[in-house]
UniProtKB/Swiss-Prot annotation:
Residues 965-1117 form the (+)RNA virus helicase C-terminal domain. In resistant plants, is bound by host protein Tm-1 (e.g. tomato Tm-1 AC A7M6E7), thereby inhibiting replication complex activity. Pfam families: RdRP_2, ToMV_Hel_N, Viral_helicase1, Vmethyltransf. Residues 52-466 are annotated as: Methyltransferase. It comes from Pepper mild mottle virus (strain Japan) (PMMV-J). Changing F976Y: Increased ability to multiply in tomato plants but reduced infectivity in original host plants (e.g. pepper and tobacco). Heterodimer of a large and a small subunit. Both large and small subunits interact, via an ATP bridge, with host protein Tm-1 (e.g. tomato Tm-1 AC A7M6E7 and AC A7M6E8). One of its GO terms (molecular function) is ATP binding. Its EC number is 2.1.1.-, 2.7.7.-, 2.7.7.48, 3.6.4.13. This is Replicase large subunit.
Length: 1612
């Protein structure tokens, strides 16, 4: 606030220095209004009068601790403990602020007079007279009321209206205002509000913690807010703890805890230490068998801890428990016992949070972080029988280890108490470093140094002695070992030896038994967390777990181990897991063991679905069928249930619905239109579909039948997993993590809004939770975009799996063709076409298929579209959606079209489940099927976790095998590798002989797209490597599995994981796929030497003669190339003002290494005196201007920060000519053949359709040139400009095709390293006469205003006169949960690339907005062929078109052109947000949007050298756009800001202050540090070498906010 006020005042002060009285009056009014607003804001805070006299430091303490109040310090009362007494009233007001006004409130031990003065008639105070001090306090409060009334009577005033109800209540019924009973026995008030509250200000100490919850419940208290004094040091063994801020102290004697003030002896309060400790450590306070109060700490202010106790109903805990008994009473009893156990366990776990979590302790006890408790060993010189008191001290852990590590290096002779004390005292005192006195890092009380030194010395001596004894291995000498030990101790302690010996033996640090010696090194310290747990355990007994029953049950399992021991890897068998599964499922362990042995030995005659006999699998296979009789849901029953009609299903609530069993003999799977339709899934209980184990664990029949059964079960498992996930999400939306959030959606029917917004719309089905909290599967219908919900629905959950009826439709289709519950196996001939990579399998399918009678099926949608496109390329439509389909489409829509085909062609069939292939062959009713695939590439992968997919079921049974062993893609060296994988001779047609190479990199840190660009397609083995490369800035990265079947010219294969990866081996199909994707070259980047490197090295060593043997001559082949296309309110946390100039310099050097070392002060001089060769087009040079006139150089301030900034240059012939060549000459010529007029009209049509709101289009009859528009233009001009128009008659115009040329003397800083190798050219200004601007300025200003009014401002922003706050508001409604592609179009040579086409587009836009035809022709004439004259440098030249940098339409024209360019190439109808400013643009599209080739379109149509970048964070006009879950924040580029701080053109201190003010205006958002981590990520995306920069952001804020500190950044 202070910073904003200071910046406002400075801006107003600079404005007031002007001579315009109107501006001065407006500035004065604005200053007055700002001051009034600030005062009103302060006045709205609650007011508290602080009457007691306190010091200035104490005033600051109170103000900082309670910023919620407007505190007025009168200093009219002198009293003891003034600060503590005054803070008590602030604490009471703070507690009352937490309570809704007017709610019935109990003030436990409170001050009823204070509430009466505030007029709180809803507060009841419990003020028991526990001792005489309470009686005195009660009488004092009565006296204060009488004193107040007497003052009112003396002044002849009446009681104010807001106090009168409370005084009336006290007069009529004093017991309703205050009672003298403890809170536990208070009878309360008769009339209460809906919710009752309580406050306890320093009164919890006297209420037993065990009775507190019950007392609150008796008064029906909803929430209780409390405050009490406490100190972490109370957990030490010290008897005295000081509270310095309020001048008080605690003293402890056993369980008696006394509280007193330092300068006051009469106020002494005594409490129970154990009771106070319970309030600190306990989390829950039971009130009844049902209710409990949960404690939560709020804040700590001036030695006072604030917390609240919330009332909770434990009956809302989940009560469900599984029970198999038939006795209802026993069932209900077991349920109650289980629930009470769960309730108690939940509360105990809540209480243990503080005791078990060290981070929680550090949060609530911040002073104790990194502090340890060290014992002190007292040296006694008195008689033996004297008992010594134990003492402990809390010191820094770092200090302890610094001392111990140092003195442990001492030799035996040097290890004395004196040396230890000397070292400890030296590191505690001040030291001198390089002539500068530095304060010690550790603030340890000097009174403790001697005792601490003794502890460190004794600890080290014992530890070294123990090490010596271990080394010597107890060798026998003339003296016994015990004598050696005592000799060493005597030498160390000299005359103190007898007492030290007694101390060591009494403390049991050394145990002596005759000549046996035992040395025990004591614990060095105890952490604060351990002491907290110890103190709490001493008063609260922790529960102990009884494990006897589990041990007895585990013992029974050993009888079954003798049967299992004969199996391989039987030592890895987990007995405990096996025991739990057998007990849960009711399986005899001995029987299970025998079945395992029989199955593994192939003696059982059964095929089990699991791959190996694990503990769970065996128990599941032997589980008996369980029929559930619970009402209210549809249940799955055992296989002996016969066929049921719909009526029977409804009556019995039973259906045999999912899965297949080998012993099914009923007709339950017969085809039935009524049962087999998708409607059977509607409103079916989720428990029916969610299967926690296989419905059939044993498959029988031929292999194809078993494969079909396993495939159907896999579909059921997939549907079960989807429903299970939705059921979990619908009950707990907070459980969705960020990675999976975009896959799910949860709709609240009551609120009519999405709690979790899904990425897509129009889901086919979902999971519904009704008013009874039961979940069902529902087929969704829509009314427009809204879901049609039932009356009892509460929530609807959807996911990416529920977009279509995928698994449901497949299950329906497959079950419709079952015969007697068994799959039908077709008699068609199945031929496997096994082809090597790149053999042309798709081309062969197109050549063999007859689309009139055959069917082509492919796994993916894109592959199907590709085949249809290639088949119809001749113009004749032969391939349709009926004969070329995806596998999913064929299964889900089975029966709705042709069902019989002659031949079936299945592309990439080996990537499908073999059971799916068998079903496809049978359902197509074909006579012959061709399955195309690659037996050596990646096969079908089971995507459902925990679903069993035995290995023997993965083999596809076929009748014939055809091989294709000629690759059209792979080079010769890869063909040599393929011959090692395939049977038969593999040949190639490629002319490339060698294509492989590899490079071992030092680590993942070296991967950077700038320093190490990767050629071609980037492929990784794992998703983690893919994510890492994408985060480093690489684009278009995919895994090996994702690119199977695709072809690329060049491939970069990357491995950044040093740990072993299972899929990287010589036998892995992933290796084969990765090495066979390229046609020209592949390079492998790896951090370790692995199997891939071994293969590549072997291929590099193969002779060229041998590789030529694998080549064959063929005609020109055209291989399909598949290439990827480029596709609220902010939280405010004030930034700490820390850091130094060195921080900013370090950050600049890390981001732009080397720029600060460039000495460019005399580059302009060097340019003048050396010979230069320039490529100049036709121009006229006045060589008399080649030597610039001598001018006195202005003195400037010298910046402290070293950057690449240059001093202002002097205009001259050479300097201006270089700038003209750079900015105006040598314009690019990339455009193709363009029909300018027609194309411009089409582009403008797209521009108006994309950006303008049709309802707001401007009518044609609005005058553009009027007195009002001219006055608006004049108001924006400077006085010097108006003076040039004094003699202008507005009758005739100067030549509109003539422009003046000049340069900007200050070079523009670029945030790259080009300054190290280039001489940057200056920016030019090409401008018209002011007389021309006086005519066209108002016209285009009015056109611009009307254009911006018609723009759809909710989606588009044309950045004209916008503030950073307006930018934040524009982007604030971006949904951070919706994946987006952020695009930036970077155009080089933007101004001089604009030609006749750009002018035509711009003129067409102005004409449609209403520009007069005559003015349009004049303006067009002035921008076709133009003359530039530079009178200062003596240069004259002619230019065609181009954008003039000083024209009246320069900014808006550039903005319009970039917007029109993007609207002509990109699908703007899908755009979420877009912003344009000059040649800058930022676009937000939905993730995955397809984009055309931007570079080609920009070149051929717009003559632009353009590149389209996809970013994670937007960068617009030198600002980072950070969108987050609360909105958006715009940060000014910190590197650009630091670069400006190295400016060398600052003239004087006044100029410097103006410079600081301008920087404050643009960089104000840096004062909010809440999103610094996001800013680090955004900067790291643009500048790869940038370190985390929160330290430099704080330093920038520090210097910009302080006027005097900012002056130190520049020297005279």
């Amino acid at each position: 606030m202070a910073y904003t006020q200071q910046a406002t005042n400075a801006a107003l002060a600079s404005t007031l220095r002007g001579n315009n009285p109107l501006v001065n009056d407006l500035a004065n009014r604005r200053l007055y209004e700002s001051a009034v607003e600030q005062c009103n804001a302060h006045d709205r805070r609650p007011k508290v009068n602080f009457l007691r006299s306190i010091s200035e430091e104490q005033t600051l303490i109170a103000t900082k601790a309670y910023p919620e109040f407007q505190i007025t310090f009168y200093n009219t009362q002198n009293a003891v403990h003034s600060l503590a007494g005054g803070l008590r009233s602030l604490e009471l007001e703070y507690l009352m602020m937490q309570i809704p006004y007017g709610s019935t409130t109990y003030d436990i031990g409170g001050n009823f007079a204070a509430h009466m003065f505030k007029g709180r008639d809803y507060v009841h105070c419990c003020m028991p007279n526990m001792d005489l001090r309470d009686v005195m306090r009660h009488n004092a409060q009565k006296d204060s009321i009488e004193l107040y009334l007497s003052k009112l009577a003396q002044k002849k005033k009446v009681i104010p209206p807001y106090q009168k109800p409370c005084f009336d209540k006290y007069t009529d019924d004093p017991q309703s205002v205050v009672c003298s009973k403890p809170f536990q026995h208070c009878e309360g008030v008769s009339h209460c509000t809906d919710k009752v509250y309580a406050v306890a200000l320093h009164s919890l100490y006297d209420i037993p913690a065990d009775e507190f919850g019950a007392a609150l419940l008796r008064r029906n208290v909803h929430v209780c807010y409390a405050a009490f004094h406490f100190s972490e040091n109370l957990l030490l063994e010290d008897s005295y703890v000081s509270l310095d801020d309020i001048g008080a102290f605690f003293s402890r004697e056993g369980d008696m805890l006394n509280f007193s003030f330092v300068a006051e002896s009469t106020l002494n309060y005594t409490h129970s230490y154990s009771n106070v400790l319970k309030y600190v450590c306990k989390t829950y306070f039971p009130a009844s068998s049902r209710e409990v109060y949960m404690k939560e700490f709020l804040v700590t202010r001036v030695n006072t801890w604030f917390c609240k106790f919330s009332r909770l109903d434990t009956f809302v805990l989940y009560r469900g428990v599984y029970h198999r008994g038939v006795d209802k009473e026993q069932f209900y009893s077991a349920m109650e016992d289980a629930w009470h156990y769960k309730k108690t366990l939940a509360m105990m776990n809540s209480e243990r949070i503080l005791l078990e979590d060290s981070s929680s302790v550090n949060y609530w006890f911040p002073k104790m972080k990194d502090m340890v408790i060290v014992p002190l060993f007292d040296v006694s010189l008195q008689n033996e029988g004297k008992r010594l008191a134990r003492k402990e001290v809390m010191v820094s852990k770092d200090f302890v280890y610094t001392v111990l590590n140092h003195i442990r290096t001492y030799q035996s002779k040097a290890l004395t108490y004196a040396n230890v004390l000397s070292f400890v005292e030296s590191i505690r005192s001040r030291v001198i470093i390089n002539g500068v006195t530095a304060r010690s890092e550790w603030d340890v009380d000097k009174a403790l140094l001697q005792s601490l030194s003794m502890t460190f010395f004794l600890q080290t001596k014992l530890a070294m002695l123990k090490d010596d004894l271990v080394v010597q291995k107890f060798q026998v000498h003339s003296k016994s070992l015990t004598e050696y030990v005592w000799d060493e101790i005597t030498a160390a302690f000299h005359n103190c030896f007898p007492t030290i010996k007694e101390r060591l033996i009494n403390k049991k640090l050394i145990t002596v038994s005759e000549k046996a010696l035992e040395i025990k090194v004591p614990d060095l310290y105890v952490t604060f967390h351990d002491r907290l747990v110890k103190e709490y355990k001493s008063s609260v007994e922790m529960p102990v777990l009884d494990v006897k029953k589990s041990l007895e049950e585990a013992e029974v399992m050993y009888n079954a181990l003798s049967e299992i021991s004969i199996l391989k890897d039987s030592d890895k068998f987990d007995v405990d897991v096996f025991s739990r599964m057998c007990n849960t499922l009711g399986v005899d362990p001995l029987v299970a063991a025998k079945v395992m042995v029989a199955v593994v030995s192939n003696e059982s005659g059964l095929t089990l679905t699991f791959e190996r006999p694990t503990e769970a699998n065996v128990a599941l296979a032997l589980q008996p069928t369980i029929t559930s009789k619970e009402e209210g849901s549809l249940k799955i029953v055992s296989s002996d249930v016969g066929e049921s009609s719909i009526k029977e299903v409804v009556r019995k609530s039973e259906i045999s619905m999912l899965g297949l069993t080998g012993n099914t003999v009923s007709d339950e799977f017969q085809r039935s239109t009524e049962i087999e339709s998708l409607q059977q899934f509607h409103m079916v209980s989720t428990e029916t579909i969610i299967r926690k184990q296989m419905h059939a664990m044993v498959y029988t029949g031929p292999l194809k039948v078993q494969q079909c059964k396993n495939y159907l079960d896999s579909l059921v498992a997939s549907l079960s997993a989807a429903v299970s996930n939705l059921k979990k999400i619908i009950k707990d939306t907070a459980a969705i993590d960020l990675e999976t959030k975009e896959k799910f959606g949860v709709y609240d029917v009551c609120l009519k809004k999405w709690l979790v917004k899904p990425l897509s719309k129009g889901h086919a089905w979902g999971v519904v939770m009704d008013s009874d909290y039961k979940c069902f599967v529902a087929l969704l219908t829509y009314d427009g975009e809204n879901i049609v919900c039932g009356e009892t629905w509460r929530r609807v959950a959807v996911s990416s799996e529920s977009l279509v009826y995928s698994d449901m439709g497949k299950i329906r289709a497959i079950r419709s063709v079952l015969k007697d519950g068994e799959p039908h196996i077709s008699s068609a001939k199945v031929t496997l076409v096994d082809g090597v990579p790149g053999c042309g399998k798709t081309k062969e399918i197109l050549s063999r298929v007859n689309f009139d009678e055959d069917l082509v099926l492919v796994p993916g949608k894109q592959a199907a579209e590709m085949i249809r496109r290639r088949a119809n390329s001749s113009g004749l439509i032969v391939a349709t959606k009926e004969n070329v389909r995806t596998v999913d489409s064929f299964l889900m829509n089975y029966g709705r079209g042709p069902c019989q085909y002659k031949r079936l062609f299945l592309d990439e069939g080996l990537m499908l489940h073999p059971g799916c292939v068998n079903f496809l062959v049978g359902m197509s009713l074909c006579s012959e099927a061709f399955v195309y695939g690659d037996t050596q590439q990646i096969p079908y992968i089971n995507r459902v976790a925990t679903f069993p997919y035995p290995k023997h079921l993965s083999q596809l049974e076929v009748d014939a095998v055809e091989t294709r062993r000629t690759t059209l893609r792979c080079p010769a060296d890869i063909t040599f590798f393929l011959n090692q994988k395939y049977e038969g001779q593999v040949m190639c047609t490629s002319s490339v002989t060698r294509s492989v190479s590899h490079e071992v990199i030092q680590g993942a840190a070296v991967m950077n797209p700038v320093s190490k660009p990767l050629k071609g397609k980037v492929i990784t083995f794992t998703q983690s490597d893919k994510s890492l490369l994408l985060s480093r800035g690489y684009e278009d990265v995919h895994t090996v599995h994702e690119v199977q079947g695709e072809t690329f010219e060049d491939v970069s294969l990357v491995r950044l994981t040093p740990t072993p990866v299972g899929i990287i081996s010589k036998q892995s199909p992933h290796l084969l796929v990765s090495l066979s994707r390229h046609t020209r070259s592949i390079k492998y980047y790896t951090v370790v030497l692995d199997a891939v490197v071994s293969v590549l090295r072997d291929l590099e060593c193969v002779s060229s003669y041998l590789l030529d043997m694998y080549k064959v001559d063929v005609s020109t082949q055209y291989q399909l190339q598949i290439e990827s296309v480029y596709k609220g309110v902010n939280l405010f946390v004030a930034a700490p003002k820390t850091g130094d100039v060195s921080d900013m310099q370090y950050y600049y050097d890390k981001c732009l290494p080397g720029n600060s070392t460039i000495l460019n002060e005399y580059d302009a001089v060097t340019m003048q005196i050396r010979e230069n060769s320039l490529n100049v087009k036709d121009c006229v040079l006045d060589m008399s201007k080649s030597v610039p006139l001598p001018r006195e150089s202005e003195t400037t301030l010298k910046p402290v920060i070293r950057t690449a900034a240059e001093k202002p240059r002097k205009p001259g012939l050479l300097e201006n000519l270089v700038a003209m060549i750079k900015r105006n000459f040598n314009s690019p010529e990339l455009v193709g053949v363009v029909d300018i007029e027609d194309t411009a009209s089409l582009v403008v049509d797209k521009f108006f359709d994309a950006y303008l709101i049709k309802e707001k289009k401007k009518p044609k009859n609005i005058p553009l040139l009027s007195r009002a528009s001219l006055e608006r233009w004049i108001e924006k001009q400077e006085k010097s400009t108006i003076g040039q128009l004094a003699d202008f008659d507005f009758i005739d115009l100067p030549a509109v095709d003539q422009y003046r040329h000049m340069i900007k003397q200050q070079p523009k800083q670029r945030l790259d390293l080009s300054i190290q190798t280039e001489y940057p050219a200056l920016q030019t200004i090409v401008y018209h006469s002011k007389k021309i601007n006086a005519l066209f300025g108002p016209v285009f200003s009015e056109l611009t205003r009307q254009l911006l009014e018609t723009i759809d401002s909710s989606r588009f922003m044309f950045y004209t006169r916008k503030t950073p706050t307006q930018i934040e508001e524009f982007f604030s409604d971006l949904d951070s949960n919706v994946p987006m592609d952020i695009l930036e179009l970077d155009i080089s040579k933007y101004d001089k690339s604009q030609n006749e086409f750009h002018c035509a587009v711009e003129y067409e836009i102005w004409k449609r907005l209403g520009l007069d035809d005559f003015l349009a022709e004049v303006w067009k004439h002035g921008h076709r062929k133009t003359t530039l004259k530079d009178y200062t440098a003596g240069i004259k030249t002619c230019l065609w078109y181009q954008r003039k940098s000083g024209d009246v339409t320069t900014f808006i024209g550039n903005t319009i052109i970039i917007a029109a360019c993007l609207s002509s190439m990109l699908p703007m109808e899908r755009l979420i947000k877009g912003a344009f400013c000059g040649d800058d643009s930022i676009l937000y599209f939905p993730k995955g949007t397809d984009f055309p080739d931007i570079q080609q379109g920009a070149n051929l149509l717009w003559n632009f050298e353009a590149k389209l970048f996809r970013k994670r964070y937007g960068y617009f006009c030198g600002r980072y756009i950070i969108h987050h879950d609360r909105g958006c924040i715009v940060y000014y580029d910190p590197l650009k800001l630091i670069s400006k701080l190295g400016a060398k053109h600052i003239k004087n201190r006044e100029h410097l202050e103006e410079f600081r003010t301008s920087l404050c205006d643009v960089a104000g958002s840096l004062n909010n540090c809440a999103y610094y981590t996001h800013l680090d990520d955004a900067v790291g995306e643009v500048i790869k070498t940038a370190p985390p920069g929160s330290f430099v952001y704080r330093a920038l804020v520090k210097y910009l906010c302080d006027k005097r500190l900012f002056q130190t950044l520049f020297l005279e």
